[in-house]
């Protein structure tokens, strides 16, 4: 995810003598814990000013364009800035930011130099842990418990642990030890995976979003008491044990799901609050109104049940992401009650004087949700520590960050850095996905640049790994899959833009449904009610009763599960759960026994597509290339060096055939086929074809035949029987020129135009010697014409011209080839005739003039 170890070494302990392959005494003697700052560039003076002493500037020394300054600092967090020729600037090598007073600065986090630290290196099946002493040089007082099976090298101060015999799955080691002087080492976490999952990349993800209270009720003893909220807005009893049961049943694995994203675990508010309409009462069943920072909501389960759920997921090769709320809390939250200064006192977002964009950093979502002030260092540090606690305590694998654009940039940068330093010690990526809700504002790419730029703002080397792809959602779900206002050429274009408009290396999350929008099947179904209605009195969408709605969802998921990124399935979408706007889009998950045949068929098809994605490197990691698009048909390829997948979507009511010059694909889903370079696509279909071993494309791609150019006039002395296009250079015997001119002028449509012979049935090609000169001539052909590919001894050749062109019947080899359409031959003869006639007439006229 991020290479934060470099930043850690540079900014917190920075100058460290070599610690490997040296004598222990030498290591102790040369160890140095001063902090080094550097700035590169041309300047007259460069200084550092920091929170350690705002009254004293520290001059930096220049050496070959690099300015260096060293300080000995006590443990703590410090604001600072560089002063370059009297201009105050951030440290360009340090992305971390913080506020001192009302001024934003670079910040540095300094550790206690007396305490030892660990350095981690995982290479293949070998984990190497280096002990780095504190400033007094004392060695380790023993071996960390989780390294008890390792080998110790006292010279290099290293433990080496062989992990080849570890069970497949996730392992998290905690390294804790004192040195011989009693100094406590900074503890270190070392999470890593063994087995197939060790090769996992987050672009391999198929994410399944679970709104826990609305999923499966696995333990009725913790069912919540009704709050009296409006219909659809109260607690309904889903819990962590229900999720565990579904993991252990194999439901997710059978669907190809390998990542679960669950809504917040925190204890949420009791009672109700007013919905945005100010009329309806709603509860906190969704978890986004936290009141406790480090407590599992008892209506969802216990800490032990959360740990059991995560362990079950890991045993199944499934990663678990938490949902972390960074923008706000509920007014009953402990922090708001005890530390009101940690929160902004802003207007209510979306009201007439409080624009969502202009006031995005300090407005409140509702009056009962205080907005976190990330400029307050105490608040910032506490919310980051809480995030680390959840990830560590429950061995989670990543997080979805809620409402990203409503917090200061430093909130994301600092959170990302701390998570990276704590959990990515052995190279295991922790995926951080953001929610930056944007839109799609028009067909022109330029019109959408602000949308892309806002999402990109929070990603990159020091930012989030990816975000929900809101631009793509609104471009294609709003306009293609649900309304049909736009066609598959539009779908192709905006899918391609998601590949080139986002921060390089980011792993975006495409989706067609979520807890914030009406269910996709209800948006595609116009027969049961307005999909944007929220409340029962307005008339809510019902269960669709037609095939078209389910076909639309399959088209959408056929695209989603084969497109690049880490696609997300919203719980229930896989079988076509219906519903209007929030909260009606959050029905409880229905068991398969309550599905109808349409729902069962949809779920089976989406499961097959998910499994296919899981099994295909091309569908997970391949590049996206559009091969064909029309209003109703889209064909694109996902390809790696070793394999490729051909995805074929047809929303039309008729079959289609497309010439694609591809070969060696095997149908893996659906019924589209490629035969001799022709792709046949059934109506209303989704198909995926797979080709393995892409190492030799030359033998797998049917090349277009090269057009042979030459003389095509059969009466010419240089007639080329292989020529398909006339080169205009035919030559003739001198004594036949006038005859040819006269004949061609008088008979500019030759007798050949009257020959109508089926090119596939001209002659019997069974090699039983039934073909003869008589048959050939009766068919209007020329017997024993010369053709270089039929040059074996005693070969019989018949050349026939009909309305389809020249047909060469190479009898002994049972070959037949159409060279040139007859119309082209006739036009060529006419052209040559006119030219020759003009020459003759010109000569005669000149003779008459006595020239």
Where are these predicted regions, by residue range?
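Loop/helix patches that line or flank the sugar-binding groove of alpha-linked glycan CAZymes
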Residues: 218-235, 493, 502-663, 681-682, ...
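C-terminal membrane-anchoring or membrane-association module
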Residues: 836-851
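Active-site-proximal helices and loops of the catalytic beta/alpha 8
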Residues: 139-141, 318, 386-388, 392-397, ...
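Aromatic-rich carbohydrate-binding modules that target alpha-glucans
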Residues: 28-77, 85-111, 142-159
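C-terminal beta-strand-rich structural cap/linker in extracellular carbohydrate-active enzymes
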Residues: 79-80, 676-700
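Primarily marks secretory-pathway-exposed extracellular/lumenal segments that are disulfide-
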Residues: 20-24, 699-817, 833
């Amino acid at each position: 995810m991020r290479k934060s170890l470099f930043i850690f070494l540079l900014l917190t302990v920075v100058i460290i003598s070599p610690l490997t392959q040296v004598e222990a005494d030498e290591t102790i003697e040369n160890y140095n814990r001063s902090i080094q700052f550097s700035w590169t560039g041309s300047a007259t003076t460069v200084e550092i000013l920091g929170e350690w002493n705002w009254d004293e500037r520290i001059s930096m020394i220049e050496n070959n364009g690099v300015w260096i300054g060293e300080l000995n600092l006590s443990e703590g967090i410090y604001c600072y800035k560089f002063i370059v020729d009297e201009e105050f600037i951030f440290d360009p090598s340090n992305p971390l930011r913080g506020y001192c007073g009302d001024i934003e600065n670079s910040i540095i986090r300094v550790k206690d130099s007396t305490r030892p630290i660990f350095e981690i290196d995982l290479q293949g099946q070998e984990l190497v842990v280096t002990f780095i002493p504190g400033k007094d040089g004392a060695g380790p007082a023993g071996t960390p418990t989780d390294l008890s099976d390792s080998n110790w090298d006292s010279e290099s101060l290293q433990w080496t642990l062989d992990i080849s015999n570890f069970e497949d799955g996730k392992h998290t080691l905690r390294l804790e030890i004192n040195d011989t002087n009693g100094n406590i080492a900074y503890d270190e976490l070392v999470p890593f995976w063994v087995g197939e999952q060790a090769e996992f990349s987050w672009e391999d993800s198929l994410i399944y979003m679970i709104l826990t209270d609305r999923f499966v009720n696995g333990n009725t003893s913790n069912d919540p008491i009704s709050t009296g909220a409006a219909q659809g807005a109260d607690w309904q009893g889903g819990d962590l044990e229900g999720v565990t049961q579904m993991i252990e049943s194999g439901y997710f694995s059978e669907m190809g799901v390998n990542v679960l994203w669950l809504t917040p675990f925190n204890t949420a508010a009791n009672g109700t609050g007013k919905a945005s309409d100010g009329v309806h009462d709603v509860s906190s069943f969704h978890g986004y109104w936290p009141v406790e920072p480090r407590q599992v909501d008892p209506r969802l389960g216990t800490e032990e049940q959360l740990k059991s759920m995560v362990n079950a997921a890991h045993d199944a090769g499934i990663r678990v992401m938490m949902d972390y709320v960074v923008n706000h809390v509920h007014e009953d939250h402990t922090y708001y009650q005890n530390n009101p200064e940690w929160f902004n006192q802003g207007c209510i977002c979306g009201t007439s004087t409080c624009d969502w964009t202009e006031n995005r950093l300090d407005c409140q979502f509702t009056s009962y949700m205080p907005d976190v002030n990330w400029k307050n260092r105490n608040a910032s540090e506490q919310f980051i520590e809480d995030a680390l606690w959840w990830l560590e305590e429950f061995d989670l694998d990543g997080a979805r960050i809620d409402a990203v654009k409503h917090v200061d940039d430093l909130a994301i940068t600092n959170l990302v850095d701390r998570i990276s330093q704590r959990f990515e010690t052995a190279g295991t990526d922790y995926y951080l996905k953001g929610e930056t809700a944007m839109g799609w504002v028009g067909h022109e790419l330029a019109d959408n640049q602000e949308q892309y730029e806002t999402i990109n703002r929070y990603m990159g080397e020091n930012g989030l790994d990816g975000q929900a792809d809101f631009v793509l959602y609104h471009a294609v779900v709003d306009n293609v899959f649900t309304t049909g206002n736009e066609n598959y050429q539009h779908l192709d274009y905006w899918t391609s833009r998601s590949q080139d408009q986002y921060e390089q290396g980011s792993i975006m999350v495409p989706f067609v449904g979520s807890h914030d929008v009406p269910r996709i099947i209800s948006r595609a179904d116009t027969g049961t009610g307005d999909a944007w209605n929220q409340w029962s009195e307005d008339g809510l969408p019902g269960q669709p009763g037609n095939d078209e709605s389910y076909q639309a969802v399959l088209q959408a998921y056929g695209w989603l599960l084969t497109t690049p990124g880490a696609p997300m399935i919203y719980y229930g979408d896989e079988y076509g759960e219906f519903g209007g706007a929030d909260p009606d889009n959050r029905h409880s998950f229905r068991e398969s026994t309550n599905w109808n045949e349409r729902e069962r068929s949809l779920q089976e098809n989406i499961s097959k597509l998910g499994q296919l994605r899981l099994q295909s490197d091309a569908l997970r990691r391949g590049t996206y290339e559009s091969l064909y698009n029309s209003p109703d048909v889209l064909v694109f390829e996902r390809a790696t060096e070793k394999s490729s997948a051909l995805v074929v979507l047809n929303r039309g009511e008729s079959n289609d055939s497309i010439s694609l010059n591809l070969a060696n694909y095997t149908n893996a889903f659906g019924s589209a086929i490629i035969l001799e370079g022709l792709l046949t696509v059934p109506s209303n279909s989704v198909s995926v074809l797979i080709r393995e071993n892409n190492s030799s494309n030359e033998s797998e791609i049917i090349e277009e035949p090269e057009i042979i150019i030459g003389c095509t006039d059969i009466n010419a002395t240089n007639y080329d029987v292989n020529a398909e296009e006339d080169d205009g250079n035919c030559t003739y015997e001198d004594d036949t020129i006038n005859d040819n001119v006269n004949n061609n002028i008088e008979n500019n449509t030759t007798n050949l135009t009257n020959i109508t012979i089926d090119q596939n049935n001209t002659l019997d090609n069974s090699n039983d010697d039934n073909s003869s000169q008589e048959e050939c001539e009766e068919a209007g052909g020329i017997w024993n014409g010369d053709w270089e590919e039929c040059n074996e001894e005693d070969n019989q050749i018949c050349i026939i011209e009909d309305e389809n062109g020249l047909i060469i019947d190479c009898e002994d080899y049972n070959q037949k080839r159409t060279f040139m359409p007859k119309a082209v031959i006739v036009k060529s003869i006419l052209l040559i005739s006119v030219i020759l006639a003009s020459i003759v007439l010109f000569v005669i006229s000149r003779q008459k003039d006595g020239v």
